[in-house]
Amino acid sequence: FLPMLAGLAASMVPKLVCLITKKC
């Protein structure tokens, strides 16, 4: 459960940074 959650977070963070900073 925890490794899957960590993997999900790792995939979501770059997308959030991309949207927030507008640097894609």
Curated annotation (Swiss-Prot):
GO terms for biological process: defense response to bacterium. Coiled coil: none annotated. It comes from the Eukaryota. Its main location: secreted. It is found in: Secreted. InterPro entries: Antimicrobial_frog_1 (IPR012520). It holds the Pfam family Antimicrobial_1. The keyword Transport does not apply. Expressed by the skin glands. Disulfide bonds join 18-24. Keywords: Amphibian defense peptide, Antibiotic, Antimicrobial, Disulfide bond, Secreted. Signal peptide: none annotated. One of its GO terms (cellular component) is extracellular region. Antibacterial activity against Gram-positive bacterium S.aureus and Gram-negative bacterium E.coli. Belongs to the frog skin active peptide (FSAP) family. Brevinin subfamily. This is Brevinin-1La.
